[in-house]
């Protein structure tokens, strides 16, 4: 980074020039290139460890499935999809998509090992969620109240008013809230 600075020499002459704010002999592009080189030389586990350390990860990485970095090789997932087809490391399969759902499916697919187990998981997964429960936002469906609030027959119906109280007429209400004007001595004179 450079800043323009005017220097007044002892003879009264002014000299204009650019003065570097960096240490002498070091340009900012050189610093950036050195940082870039250091980051590229780090391995993926080192970077992940540093990120977890900075973020204060409380062991969540052990509970959650690992999502590969963009440049990381996914040899196990390509071999599990089809054992006969070999894909070059670093390239994605044509049907492979990015996202949380797909990465979770890859992790479960790696542990199951066979296509039959994957089919059982997908069939079991479709049975747990009932699509009839979720309606469109724009539809006029009546929502099942019991599903959200439980059995409403158990809840007692409370009357609005207690049976001992009677309805007050307008005249009675006004007479209760009437404030008489104070008599002033000046008006009586």
Swiss-Prot record:
Q: Which branch of life, at top level? A: Eukaryota
Q: Mind telling me which Pfam families this protein's record contains?
A: UPF0688
Compositionally biased tracts (Basic and acidic residues):
59-73, 93-103
Q: Which GO terms describe its cellular component?
A: nucleus
What are the disulfide bonds? none
Keywords, A to Z, come to:
Nucleus
Q: Which PANTHER family match?
A: UPF0688 PROTEIN C1ORF174
Protein name per Swiss-Prot or TrEMBL: UPF0688 protein C1orf174 homolog
């Amino acid at each position: 980074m450079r800043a323009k600075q005017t220097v007044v020499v002892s003879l009264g002459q002014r000299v204009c020039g650019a003065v570097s704010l960096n240490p002498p002999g070091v340009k900012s592009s050189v610093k950036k290139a050195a940082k870039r080189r250091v980051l590229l030389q780090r391995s993926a586990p080192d970077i992940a460890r540093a990120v977890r350390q900075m973020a204060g990860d409380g062991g969540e990485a052990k509970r959650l499935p690992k999502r590969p970095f963009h440049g990381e090789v996914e040899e196990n997932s390509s071999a599990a999809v089809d054992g006969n087809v070999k894909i070059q490391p670093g390239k994605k399969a044509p049907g492979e998509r990015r996202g949380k759902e797909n990465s979770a499916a890859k992790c479960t697919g790696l542990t199951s090992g066979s296509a039959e187990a994957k089919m059982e998981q997908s069939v079991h997964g479709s049975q747990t969620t009932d699509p009839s429960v979720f309606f469109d936002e724009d539809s006029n469906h009546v929502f099942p109240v019991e599903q959200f609030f439980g059995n409403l027959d158990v809840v007692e119906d409370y009357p609005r008013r207690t049976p001992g109280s009677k309805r007050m007429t307008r005249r009675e209400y006004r007479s209760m809230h009437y404030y008489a004007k104070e008599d002033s001595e000046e008006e009586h004179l």
